[in-house]
Design a protein with these regions (language model features):
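Cofactor-binding active-site loop characterized by glycine-rich and histidine/acidic residues
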Residues: 54-175, 336-337, 341-342, 350-351, ...
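A glycine-rich helix N-cap at a beta->alpha junction
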Residues: 99-109, 174-186, 406-418
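Peripheral docking tails and interdomain loops at the edges
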Residues: 309-316, 423-425, 444-445, 563-614
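Non-catalytic terminal/interface segments that mediate subunit docking, oligomerization
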Residues: 78, 287-394, 400-410, 507
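Glycine-/acidic-rich phosphate or pyrophosphate-binding loops and their flanking alpha/beta elements
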Residues: 242, 269-272, 318-333, 349-355, ...
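N-terminal amphipathic, basic-rich helices that act as targeting or association modules
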Residues: 12-93, 249, 253, 260-264, ...
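Generic long, charged, amphipathic alpha-helical segments
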Residues: 363, 520, 524-543
């Protein structure tokens, strides 16, 4: 990535250094708050240049975060940040400024909100579209406990496309909960005319006079049902003509906005007015990703997530790049191939495909359930849909996978990216459950290729199958540069990489590298298993009967994963050769680099040797 020149950013952050608690903001005037926003911007750019993290989204929410903490009182009032990746300013203001140097590092603070990290983090996050549900739950609990504090959800326009958001809005409108939803819309710009009008209208209709008049008028009109109905309809029609809030109003959630999300003064005035409304309401703000940093404003996607400096000279292709290359090559020769992704086209390597075959590419936004069943529908008409999805997000489409794909044995290929330990994103994004929750489903094939070349072969084989098939692959790069091939791997057949004696290591996916290193030291047989379902049962039984010790290793939870499948096979065949199952332990994972986590959880060569030698 383009490194920022941070020497000029190392300044004396006088105002920021004086902020020890969010309540300190209440002593500042608007001019001082604007100066503080500039200091935070400089601090974020300098800090993330060293640690990596989400830059553009956090530059876009500095002013909003300052306004929220100025008007409300956390942790009594609660902020629920959707996804949580845009809450860095919130972390800085709530006592974690000095910990930002450890952001996303092992034993450091999380890149998302985390309840165990601070009392100001009301609800943990990482996945999208959960904030309104959680904030509504908190608001209802406040009502039941006779607590007048405000529960606030901050959600982006992208996250609002998730169906769970609309489920929550539908419920919220049927309650009297003290819920404020802040819709952070960073996909639009405000023209001067609309902006000025919106500011005036929002300040007017969120003020006490308007609220009181509306309340008293409706109180009177309740005695005259027909007139009340007409008045309500007239009000909605008027607001629908000048404000884009009709949808929310129809759901029973009062709409205010849009306002400039970078104008601290108008944000504070509007939030102060909305604080006095004790029912579900939504404030629509307009922001710009990367605000205030030119390169990030011009290319917010590139600077959505920045990486720390790296000394690696590894020019091997990433697994996502290999997948994208295979997708384009195969689609060129097979017009039935369709690409589907739930808002992950860049991360999943589908950008080139979307350009080459726009009519065959479907980014369905944050809608994993829909993506899965959409693919199923296409498959019934003879198409060959490929769903590119992160392992952690496939969890959201699990019912659809079973009910709509597997039970009907539909021909859908799932390219499961970011499988295994993903590193700095931590527990919310760890793809360590897919082998366990997929292998129990009938009618499916599950492959775990060990390299980019093996991955290409696996995808070729998957494309030729007729039924549901999963190809899982990790985040990062393979150790093989050349990967294009017309070869396929035989379904259900493993590959012996190294022959040894007495000890055998069954390696799944990218665990082949540490297994080969350990195998060389132990003089052990090393098998690239390739498949989790179906297993190469004949090979496993033969290996088990001719060795004294067995080891399985996978970057999935050890509970119910690939090792468990081998153990079940041994039990069914009454084979008593001892098996050690190495996998992610049964606990919530931490964040850190992939190599740090492999070492922490015993998924490295040193630990394999230790187990094999014991």
């Amino acid at each position: 990535m383009l490194r920022f020149k941070t020497a000029s950013l190392i300044i004396y952050l006088k105002m920021l250094n004086d902020i020890q608690h969010p309540s300190d903001l209440k002593n500042l005037n608007i001019e001082e708050l604007n100066s503080l926003a500039e200091e935070i911007k400089l601090f974020l750019v300098d800090s993330l240049d060293k640690t990596g993290g989400h830059l553009s989204s956090n530059l876009g929410t500095i002013e909003l975060t300052l306004a929220l903490h100025y008007v409300f009182d956390t942790p009594n009032d609660t902020f629920v940040w959707d996804v949580g990746h845009q809450a860095y300013t919130h972390k800085i203001l709530t006592g974690r400024k000095e910990l930002m140097s450890s952001l996303r590092q092992k034993d450091g603070i999380s890149g998302f909100t985390k309840r165990s990290e601070s009392e100001h983090d009301a609800f943990g996050a990482g996945h999208s579209s959960t904030s309104i549900s959680a904030a509504l739950g908190i608001a209802i609990a406040n009502k039941l406990q006779q607590n007048s504090n405000t529960s606030i959800a901050v959600i982006g326009d992208g996250a609002l496309t998730g169906g769970m958001s609309f489920e929550a809005l539908n419920h919220a409108g049927d309650t009297d909960a003290n819920l404020l939803i802040v819709l952070n819309d960073n996909d639009m710009s405000i023209s001067k005319n609309v902006g000025a009008l919106s500011k005036y209208l929002t300040r007017l209709i969120s003020g006490k006079i308007y609220s009181t008049m509306k309340s008293k008028s409706l109180e009177f009109l309740e005695r005259l049902p027909r007139i009340q109905k007409f008045a309500k309809r007239s009000e909605e029609h008027l607001k629908g003509m000048i404000l884009p809030g009709t949808l929310f109003e129809e759901l029973g959630v009062d709409y205010f906005g849009p306002v400039d999300g970078h104008d601290i003064s108008i944000l504070i005035k509007t939030l102060q007015n909305l604080k006095n409304i004790d029912k579900p309401r939504i404030l629509h703000i307009m922001t710009k990703k990367g605000h205030g940093v030119e390169v990030a404003e011009q290319n917010p996607l590139k600077y959505h997530g920045v990486s720390p400096p790296s000394s690696s000279n590894n020019n091997f292709p990433s697994y996502s790049k290999v997948f994208g290359d295979w997708l384009c090559n195969t689609a060129t020769n097979d017009e039935r191939l369709i690409g589907i992704t739930p808002a992950m086209s860049e991360g999943s390597g589908m950008v080139e495909f979307s350009t080459m075959f726009p009519e065959r590419f479907f980014d369905v936004a944050i809608a994993e359930q829909h993506a899965v069943t959409l693919a199923g529908g296409m498959a019934t008409k003879g198409l060959k849909p490929v769903v590119a999805i992160y392992s952690t997000f496939l969890q959201r489409g699990y019912d659809q996978f079973i009910h709509d794909i597997a039970l009907q044995n539909l021909n859908v290929l799932f390219a499961i990216d970011r499988a295994g330990l993903v590193g700095a994103d931590g527990a919310t994004h760890a793809g360590i459950f897919d082998l366990s929750f997929l292998r129990c489903i009938p009618n499916i094939v599950i492959m775990a290729p060990s390299s980019s070349l093996e991955m290409y072969k696996a995808l070729n084989a998957a494309h030729n199958l007729n039924g549901p098939v999963c190809v899982r692959f990790p985040r990062g790069k393979s150790h093989i540069e050349e990967f294009k091939t017309d070869e396929v791997i035989e379904i259900g057949k493993a590959n012996i990489i190294r022959k040894g004696k007495d000890i055998a290591i069954f390696a799944f996916g990218n665990m082949i590298e540490p297994s080969i290193k350990a195998g060389n030291e132990l003089d052990a047989t090393v098998i690239d298993m390739r498949f989790i379902k179906p297993l190469d049962e004949d090979l496993i039984i033969n290996i088990a009967n001719t060795n004294k010790k067995l080891i399985s290793i996978e970057d999935n939870t050890a509970t119910g994963g690939a090792g468990s499948a081998i153990n079940e096979l041994l039990q069914r065949n009454k084979i008593r050769t001892p098996l050690s199952i190495l996998g992610v332990p049964d606990r919530i994972t931490e964040h850190g680099s992939q190599n740090e986590l492999y070492e922490l959880y015993g998924l490295d060569a040193m630990h394999i040797v230790k187990v094999g030698s014991s």
